[in-house]
């Protein structure tokens, strides 16, 4: 049987404590939380200043006079390659915005809209929809296949 003096016993205890402290401290260090859905708000959260929840009057001030004006929807033909539809709920607030691009160079890439790449379908078209529950809406990106693709970007309140 081993017989330690008090001093030897104290030194062994101290050595064991010094070895154990870093392990205990490392176990208690909080690890950063992983990014949830890359972001709580998508990169595309407004179109020309129009956001979900904005009043119809505020949206019209941002976009100007619509080509076709209605209580539930406004249509804007911005140019030959770009149009926009803004949808309103019963409280006259924006609940959806859809932008349509017909060719041209101003088409944003999926990563700029969604924060990630869209899925390529077998026919060459692109599609991706992401829900952002913390901000209360979803965003989708659709591009048809072909030489002159049509691109639809939609942002809509989660019902």
Model-found features: residue ranges?
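Bacterial N-terminal signal peptides that target proteins for export
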Residues: 2-15
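Generic leucine side-chain signal with a strong bias for well-ordered alpha-helical environments
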Residues: 16-19, 63
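C-terminal segment of classical bacterial N-terminal signal peptides
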Residues: 18-26
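Cleaved targeting-peptide boundary
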Residues: 27-41
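A cross-family detector of function-defining hotspots
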Residues: 39-40, 44-45, 51-159
